UniProtKB/Swiss-Prot annotation:
Gene3D superfamilies associated with the record: Amino acid/polyamine transporter I
Family to which the UniProt record says this protein belongs: Belongs to the amino acid-polyamine-organocation (APC) superfamily. Amino acid transporter (AAT) (TC 2.A.3.1) family.
Protein name, as recorded: L-asparagine permease
InterPro entries cross-referenced by the UniProt entry: AA-permease/SLC12A_dom, Amino_acid_permease_CS
Transmembrane segments: 34-54, 58-78, 109-129, 146-166, 171-191, 219-239, 264-284, 298-318, 353-373, 378-398, 422-442, 448-468
Species this chain originates from: Escherichia coli (strain K12)
UniProt keyword annotations, A-Z: Amino-acid transport, Cell inner membrane, Cell membrane, Membrane, Transmembrane, Transmembrane helix, Transport
Name of encoding gene: ansP
Family annotation (NCBIfam families): PRK15049.1
Subcellular location as annotated: Cell inner membrane
Length: 499
């Protein structure tokens, strides 16, 4: 190795040490049991428990195929994130990786788009809580916004506790969700095998063929549905954020990621196939969990209510996770200058409380939306959440590609956990994410208006950058500099000036 190569390698190592310094203050308290369940629970939320009812109405049995396609690409994204985590675990997750491989402007865009995702997702979750509460007739007269505010208060308080307690609560939240799905799969399979009629219909595959087949509304509605189904997997990347507070991320994260793909297949695809073989797909309704519909049709007292409690837990779990992620992402951005400096503050419990409080303020807007337009909140904010998650996943893939390039050039150590089939699968995933945006444009009116809002989001991001660039320049002036590679005539890495 030449002296120039050695110097460049040392400079990259110094840069990573500077980035790792941003992790100071966190308490590495998460164990394998908690990380495993967080990864599983992150893939099971309101997108399955609440969203599946409306999706079955729109696409029928084809929803199973849509879940399978989205689940496969979600796995690719997780494997790409796994590469980055093994390279350098960080609570800032892909925002920190964007800072390392793409510069602070990219970290700024990645961070704020991810914040948009979780801000919108949180509004969806508190809306879901309110809808679930209205399942019980006794609460029918209570305004939707009251339940939304109550959920926000409970989960906001929970997130101010130390990470060990957050992880433990999230473990039990996730366990309840998993047990609920497993219970449905077992009961549904036994009932299907018994041949007993349900709600006046004999169960079986004929419920698909006799009700319009696999694509009852044609192929296009199923394709357009992809942009909504993406939201169902919008928490899977949380394992990357949690890696910064794991006891042993090098071992725990790969195990957690590899467990996700078959569970997506079982929980999502298996559940939908079973649902449409137990009842006609038209029996499921928007606004009510299809699992609640099934158990209610069984006629067993209180089963529907029990399942409704489970889906309430799922919504609270997702809201809890969102506050966890945004607090840490906003702190990472503040450390790089892309967010206000006060968001870098930590409590004595090692919690980035300032970022969490900032997110709670946004969630209050969601409560107000529940007061103004309670019937449309879920669909309105769902598309904006999808925009944020698509951007975030794209940054993960691009950073993974840049990491591979750095490894090939000897500027980073190789990792043992890799995305299979890369770079082909990397490019294929980016193409899939682009196609989701195109499909969203056909989802009139909400999806069309959301895509039309992209230029406005872009303008706001540009304005915001001009507001933070001076602080970014000040912070990055103290960062180690990687000099220009004169032989290759390209910039290997150089901290970005705020131009």
């Amino acid at each position: 190795m030449s002296k120039h190569d050695t110097d460049t390698s040392d400079q990259h190592a110094a840069k990573r040490r500077w980035l790792n310094a941003h992790e100071e203050g966190y308490h590495k308290a998460m164990g394998n049991r908690q990380v495993q369940m967080i990864a599983i629970g992150g893939a099971i939320g309101t997108g399955l428990f609440l969203g599946a009812g409306a999706r079955l109405q729109m696409a029928g049995p084809a929803l199973a195929l849509v879940y399978l396609i989205c689940g496969l690409f979600s796995f690719f994204i997780l494997r790409a994130l796994g590469e980055l985590v093994l390279h350098r675990p960080s609570s800032g997750s892909f925002v920190s990786y964007a800072r390392e491989f793409l510069g602070e402007k990219a970290a700024y865009v990645a961070g704020w788009m991810y914040f948009i995702n979780w801000a919108m997702t949180g509004i969806v979750d508190i809306t879901a809580v309110a809808l679930y509460m209205h399942y019980w007739g006794a609460f029918g007269g209570v305004p939707q916004w009251v339940f939304a505010l109550a959920a926000l208060t409970i989960v906001g308080t929970m997130n101010m506790i130390g990470v060990k307690w957050f992880a433990e609560m999230e473990f039990w939240f996730a366990l309840i969700k998993v047990l609920a799905i497993v219970t449905f799969l077992v009961v549904g399979t036994v009932f299907l095998g018994s041949g007993q009629p349900l709600d006046g219909n004999t169960t079986g595959f004929h419920l698909i063929t006799d009700n319009g087949g696999f694509f009852p509304h044609g192929l296009l509605p199923a394709l357009v549905l992809i942009q909504g189904v993406v939201f169902a997997f919008a928490s899977i990347e949380m394992v990357g954020t949690a890696a910064g507070e794991c006891k042993d991320p090098q071992t725990m994260v790969p195990k957690a990621i590899n467990s996700v793909i078959w569970r997506i297949g079982l929980f999502y695809v298996g559940s939908v196939v079973l649902l449409v073989m137990l009842l006609p797909w038209s029996a499921y309704q928007a606004g009510q969990s299809p699992f609640v519909t099934f158990f209610s049709k069984l006629g067993v007292p209180y089963i529907g209510s029990i399942m409704n409690i489970v889906v309430l837990t799922a919504a609270l779990s997702s809201l809890n996770s969102g506050l966890y992620c945004t607090g840490r992402i906003l702190r990472s951005m503040a450390m790089g200058g892309s967010a206000p400096s006060f968001m870098a503050k930590m409590s004595r419990q090692h919690v980035p409380y300032a970022g969490i409080l900032a997110t709670l303020v946004v969630y209050v807007v969601g409560v107000f939306l529940n007061y103004l337009v309670p019937s449309r909140v879920f669909e309105i904010v769902l598309n904006f959440a999808s925009l944020g998650i698509i951007a975030s996943w794209a940054f993960i893939i691009v950073c993974q590609m840049r990491l591979r390039k750095a490894i090939k050039e000897g500027k980073a150590a190789d990792v043992s956990f890799k995305l299979p089939g890369a770079p082909f699968t990397s490019w294929l995933t980016l193409l899939f994410l682009l196609s989701v945006l195109v499909l969203m444009a056909f989802d009139y009116p909400n999806g069309t208006y959301t895509i039309a809002a992209l230029p406005i989001i872009g303008i706001l991001l540009v304005i915001g950058w001009f507001g933070v660039r001076k602080r970014v320049a000040e912070i990055h002036s103290t960062a180690p500099v990687v000099e220009e590679d004169e032989e290759k005539q390209e910039i290997v890495f150089k901290p970005e000036t705020a131009s």
